């Protein structure tokens, strides 16, 4: 092994040790990004947000997820992170309700890793926190990548059967409406799908792109599945999504991630 390889190995080991320590000592931070309902408000909707995770470095520098997620994955630590997110989020909701009576509890999109999906006791862990924190229904909307949901369809059905009776919902992200995909939706029946950025970004520029999104949206609605457009970057795209009757939108034009306080 060369000196450079030894140095890289040492650096990776140090980072892994920091991540393990952070899981034990609260070295991660929760952020939330707003998901905006596009239909006319009835006044009864609860706030909707996606929960994001940041790793707090020694000097309070915030790193984007891409820098530490691969390390967590390599060392099989993602299930521990997912559990930490559920636990911390439940505590935050409980604290907020105590501090502010009548506070509207948001619906929270929580990302799940493949490793967590295969973890048999995760559903029991979630159920315990829902019960202990006396959380209302629909607090957790667990989000899976579309490819992950397809690859682990049986595990998805198992965790749905366990958590849906407790009021948990499910979102599949990165949905593009490709051939055969709606057959899988009929089987897996998520509550939401997030439309992939590639089919949403140009809907204000041409009829074909607009018609494709509208077709996907209508098919989802026919199955009782609500739609979310991600990475919305302009008011023009946002307005087109309203006209097509996509249910929700998320992106920097609506609001960036904000630290949970």
How would you label these PLM feature ranges?
Residues 29-70, 89, 193:
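A short, well-structured catalytic beta-strand-centered motif of the EAL phosphodiesterase domain
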Residues 124-128, 155-158, 207-214:
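Charged helix-capping and loop-helix junction motifs
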Residues 69-70, 79, 161:
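Conserved long alpha-helical elements within nucleotide-processing catalytic cores of c-di-GMP signaling
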Residues 93-97, 130-131, 157-167, 214-221, ...:
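Surface-exposed amphipathic alpha-helices with a cationic face
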Residues 15, 71-72, 85-92, 126, ...:
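Structural preference for long, well-ordered alpha-helical segments in enzyme cores
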Residues 1-12, 22, 33, 58-59, ...:
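EAL-family c-di-GMP phosphodiesterase catalytic domain
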């Amino acid at each position: 092994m060369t000196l450079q390889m030894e140095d890289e190995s040492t650096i990776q080991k140090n980072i892994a040790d920091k991540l393990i320590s952070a899981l034990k000592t609260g070295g991660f931070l929760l952020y939330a990004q707003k998901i905006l309902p596009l239909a006319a408000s009835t006044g009864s909707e609860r706030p909707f947000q996606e929960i994001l995770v940041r790793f707090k470095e020694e000097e309070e520098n915030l790193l984007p997820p891409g820098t530490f997620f691969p390390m967590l994955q390599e060392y099989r630590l993602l299930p521990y992170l997912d559990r930490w997110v559920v636990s911390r989020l439940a505590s935050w909701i409980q604290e907020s309700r105590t501090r502010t009576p009548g506070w509207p509890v948001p619906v929270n999109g929580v990302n799940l890793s493949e490793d967590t999906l295969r973890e048999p006791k995760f559903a029991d862990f979630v159920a315990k926190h829902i019960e202990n924190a006396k959380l209302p229904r629909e607090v957790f909307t667990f989000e899976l990548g579309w490819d992950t949901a397809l690859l682990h369809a049986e595990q998805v059905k198992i965790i749905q059967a366990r958590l849906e009776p407790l009021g948990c919902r499910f979102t599949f992200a990165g949905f593009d409406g490709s051939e055969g995909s709606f057959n899988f939706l009929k089987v897996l029946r998520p509550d939401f799908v997030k439309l992939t950025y590639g089919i949403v970004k140009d809907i204000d520029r041409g009829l074909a792109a607009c018609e494709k999104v509208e077709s996907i949206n209508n098919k989802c609605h026919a199955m009782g599945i609500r739609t979310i457009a991600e990475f919305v970057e302009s008011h023009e795209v946002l307005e087109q999504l309203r006209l097509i009757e996509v249910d929700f939108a998320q992106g920097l034009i609506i609001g960036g991630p904000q630290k949970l306080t």
